[in-house]
Amino acid sequence: MGGSVSPPGTGEGTLQYSLIMEHLVGDKRRPKEVIPGGLGGIPTPIKSEEQKMMERVMESCGFKAALACVGGFVLGGAFGVFTAGIDTNVGFDPKDPYRTPTAKEVLKDMGQRGMSYAKNFAIVGAMFSCTECLVESYRGKSDWKNSVISGCITGGAIGFRAGLKAGALGCGGFAAFSAVIDYYLR
């Protein structure tokens, strides 16, 4: 037998074990860094640099605007296809009112309406989200006033293409809609 293992009761094996434990656990072990009151008194570990970087990216105005643009495009496309599906005039030719439209014509009209709605919803979503993020960054607060201000700016910008009165109505209407939505979602 090898001479490295000592018989029980001599104490040499205990010494080796305690040296190994001291090396692995002793003063070489770092305590886990925690934030004392992170979640209402529950200690939470400190975030790594990668987590902090991802939070900064996801909280940026550009990311929020891009996310709202993509979400608006998808939602608008679905809404456009749905409204085209229930519209009785899809594929209708006013020159020949008695002709039944073909499936290809109906699908083409549904696709065109879906794409039109998708682009409009994407633009409005990106404008509103970016404006709200910029207003929130400027004010330094996250409350209902941000959505009302950004709703007014977005509605006004969309409405001013049709004139001053339309811009004022767009500002008021979009701000009121934003206030109602914010009231129910917060």
Swiss-Prot record:
The answer to whether keyword Transcription applies is no
Q: Which Pfam families match?
A: Tim17
Which cell locations does it reside in?
Mitochondrion inner membrane
A single GO BP term for this record reads: protein insertion into mitochondrial inner membrane
Topology term for the membrane: Multi-pass membrane protein
Q: How does it assemble?
A: Core component of the TIM22 complex.
What the protein does comes down to: Essential core component of the TIM22 complex, a complex that mediates the import and insertion of multi-pass transmembrane proteins into the mitochondrial inner membrane. In the TIM22 complex, it constitutes the voltage-activated and signal-gated channel. Forms a twin-pore translocase that uses the membrane potential as external driving force in 2 voltage-dependent steps.
The record's listing under PANTHER family reads: MITOCHONDRIAL IMPORT INNER MEMBRANE TRANSLOCASE SUBUNIT TIM22 (PTHR14110:SF0)
What is this protein called in UniProt? Mitochondrial import inner membrane translocase subunit Tim22
